[in-house]
C-alpha cells in the first residue's frame, strides 16, 4: 500500500514537492501556516509567495540559472508553469507578477485531487510516515527548534528586501528606459542616472545612515548574492558602482554616454504600476530609506509602496546532514527541500523541491530513489549542497562553477554554451529513469 506524504511548508519548494509527488499518484497533505500565522516577511495568504524580488533572473543558457529553468520546464515543473503564465517584461530576465503567480500556484495545488492543503502551523515533525520539510528560510520558532534537535545544529543569516515605488511618482524626465546592452525589448528597465558628485553624496549618506540593528543573540552572516547596499557601501566608495549601480552597457540616450552610476528600476507587476529598486536590499531604518532614496534623480517625490527590510534565514548544514536524494542521513523517511537546505534563490528552491518530491513519491511506492546527473544544473546544485565541505558550507546559487569540467581544452567564450548543451543532452538521457 502506497504511503501518504506530509509536506511541511507551502512555499516554492513545498508546492513543487507536493505537485511532483501527486503527479506520480501519491496522496499528499501540504501544511501551510498562512493565513493563520505570518512570518515577518510574508504578507500574501496564498502559496508560493515571492518575498525578496519578483525576478527569476536571467533566461539565457549563458547563465546557469537559465539552464536550470529550461531543465525544470522539460521536467514539467509547476513552478515554471506558473512563471510562464504570469510573467512580466524584464529584459533578458524572467520576472513575474507576484500576486498572480501566488494565485496561480495556489489554484493548481488546491484543485489537485491528491493534494489536501491544511492551513495550520506545524510545531512538531511527525514521528512516522514520509515527511518533506520545506519550511523555508523563515521557519517559525517551535518548528525551528524541532529541526535544531533533529539536525543537531542549524545556521542562520540575514538577507534583505528591496523597496518598491509607485510608477506614477517617478519623474520620467530624469529617468531613461534601457536594458543593459539592449537585451530583451531594449527598454524594459527604468534607469536613474547619477553624476560623480551625486553618487559620492549618495554613498556618504548610506554609510552614515541609521540601520536596524540585529538582536544581541543573533550573529549576522550575509549571503553575497543578497548583500544589503549599506554593507556594500561600507566596503569602499566604489563598491556600489561595480555592483547594483554599475553603469556599464547603459547609455543615456539624451547625452549619448554612460552615466557615472545608475539605479535600475524593474517593473514589478503586469500593469506596470510598481517598480522595484534592483539590488537595493537594505536594513536602513524606514525614515532613512525615504530620505536617502529620494536623493536618487527621478525619485525625489517617490511614493514607497514597500520599504526595504531584513529577515532571518534559517538553513541546515546540508553536507553534514543530507544525502544526495534530499533525505536526512539519520532518518531517511525525512526529506529536506528549498532554502532551508542552503540553496539560494527562487529557481534553486523549486529545483530542490522537485528532487525531494520525486524521491518522496518513489519511496512511498517502494521504488529506487534517483539522483540527478551532475552534468545537469539540477544535479550540479544537488551535488554541491550535499558534497561540499561541511565546515565551510554557505548558501549557494546555481552557477557554472558547480558543474563537472568539460573534457579537453575549451575556449572560454564557448564554455558556457557547451556546458548547457551537455546538461540538456544529459537531462534527456535521464528522463526515462524518472518514468
From Swiss-Prot:
GO terms for molecular function: flavin adenine dinucleotide binding; tRNA (uracil(54)-C5)-methyltransferase activity, 5,10-methylenetetrahydrofolate-dependent. The keyword Protein biosynthesis does not apply. Its cofactor is FAD. It is found in: Cytoplasm. Signal peptide: none annotated. Keywords: Cytoplasm, FAD, Flavoprotein, Methyltransferase, NAD, NADP, Transferase, tRNA processing. Its EC number is 2.1.1.74. GO terms for cellular component: cytosol. GO terms for biological process: tRNA methylation; tRNA wobble uridine modification. Pfam families: GIDA (PF01134). It catalyses: uridine(54) in tRNA + (6R)-5,10-methylene-5,6,7,8-tetrahydrofolate + NADH + H(+) = 5-methyluridine(54) in tRNA + (6S)-5,6,7,8-tetrahydrofolate + NAD(+); uridine(54) in tRNA + (6R)-5,10-methylene-5,6,7,8-tetrahydrofolate + NADPH + H(+) = 5-methyluridine(54) in tRNA + (6S)-5,6,7,8-tetrahydrofolate + NADP(+). The keyword Transit peptide does not apply. FAD binds at residues 9-14. Transmembrane segments: none annotated. It comes from the Bacteria. Catalyzes the folate-dependent formation of 5-methyl-uridine at position 54 (M-5-U54) in all tRNAs. Belongs to the MnmG family. TrmFO subfamily. HAMAP family: TrmFO. This is Methylenetetrahydrofolate--tRNA-(uracil-5-)-methyltransferase TrmFO. It comes from Citrifermentans bemidjiense (strain ATCC BAA-1014 / DSM 16622 / JCM 12645 / Bem) (Geobacter bemidjiensis). The gene is trmFO.
Amino acid at each position: 500500500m502506497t504511503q501518504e506524504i506530509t509536506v511541511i511548508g507551502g512555499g516554492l519548494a513545498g508546492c513543487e514537492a507536493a505537485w511532483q509527488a501527486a503527479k506520480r499518484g501519491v496522496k499528499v497533505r501540504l501544511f501551510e501556516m498562512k493565513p493563520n500565522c505570518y512570518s515577518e516577511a510574508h504578507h500574501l495568504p496564498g502559496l508560493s509567495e515571492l518575498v525578496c524580488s519578483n525576478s527569476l533572473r536571467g533566461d539565457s543558457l549563458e547563465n546557469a540559472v537559465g539552464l536550470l529553468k529550461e531543465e525544470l520546464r522539460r521536467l514539467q515543473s509547476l513552478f515554471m508553469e506558473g512563471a510562464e503564465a504570469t510573467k512580466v517584461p524584464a529584459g533578458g530576465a524572467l520576472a513575474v507578477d507576484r500576486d498572480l503567480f501566488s494565485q496561480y500556484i495556489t489554484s493548481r495545488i488546491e484543485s489537485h485531487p491528491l493534494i489536501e492543503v491544511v492551513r495550520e502551523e506545524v510545531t512538531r515533525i511527525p514521528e512516522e510516515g514520509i515527511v518533506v520539510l520545506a519550511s523555508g528560510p523563515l521557519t517559525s520558532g517551535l518548528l525551528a527548534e524541532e529541526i535544531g534537535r533533529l539536525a543537531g545544529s542549524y545556521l542562520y543569516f540575514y538577507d534583505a528586501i528591496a523597496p518598491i515605488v509607485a510608477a506614477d511618482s517617478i519623474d520620467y524626465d530624469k529617468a531613461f528606459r534601457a536594458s543593459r546592452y539592449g537585451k530583451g525589448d531594449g527598454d524594459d528597465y527604468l534607469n536613474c542616472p547619477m553624476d560623480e558628485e551625486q553618487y559620492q553624496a549618495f554613498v556618504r549618506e548610506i554609510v552614515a545612515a541609521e540601520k536596524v540593528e540585529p538582536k544581541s543573540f543573533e550573529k549576522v552572516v550575509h549571503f553575497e548574492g543578497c548583500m544589503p547596499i549599506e554593507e556594500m557601501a561600507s566596503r569602499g566608495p566604489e563598491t556600489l558602482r561595480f555592483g547594483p549601480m554599475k553603469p556599464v552597457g547603459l547609455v543615456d540616450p539624451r547625452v549619448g554616454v554612460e552615466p557615472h552610476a545608475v539605479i535600475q528600476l524593474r517593473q514589478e507587476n503586469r500593469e506596470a504600476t510598481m517598480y522595484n529598486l534592483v539590488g537595493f536590499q537594505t536594513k536602513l531604518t524606514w525614515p532613512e530609506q525615504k530620505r536617502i532614496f529620494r536623493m536618487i534623480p527621478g525619485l525625489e517625490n517617490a511614493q514607497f509602496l514597500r520599504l526595504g527590510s531584513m529577515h532571518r534565514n534559517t538553513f541546515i548544514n546540508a553536507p553534514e546532514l543530507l544525502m544526495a536524494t534530499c533525505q536526512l542521513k539519520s532518518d531517511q523517511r525525512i526529506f529536506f527541500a528549498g532554502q532551508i537546505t542552503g540553496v539560494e534563490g527562487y529557481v534553486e528552491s523549486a529545483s530542490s523541491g522537485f528532487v525531494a518530491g520525486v524521491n518522496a513519491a518513489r519511496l512511498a511506492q517502494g521504488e529506487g530513489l534517483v539522483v540527478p546527473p551532475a552534468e545537469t544544473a539540477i544535479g550540479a546544485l544537488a551535488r554541491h549542497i550535499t558534497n561540499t565541505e561541511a565546515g565551510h558550507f554557505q548558501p549557494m546559487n546555481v552557477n557554472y562553477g558547480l558543474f563537472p569540467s568539460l573534457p579537453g581544452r575549451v575556449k572560454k567564450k564557448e564554455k558556457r554554451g557547451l556546458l548547457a548543451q551537455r546538461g540538456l543532452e544529459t537531462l534527456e538521457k535521464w528522463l526515462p529513469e524518472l518514468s
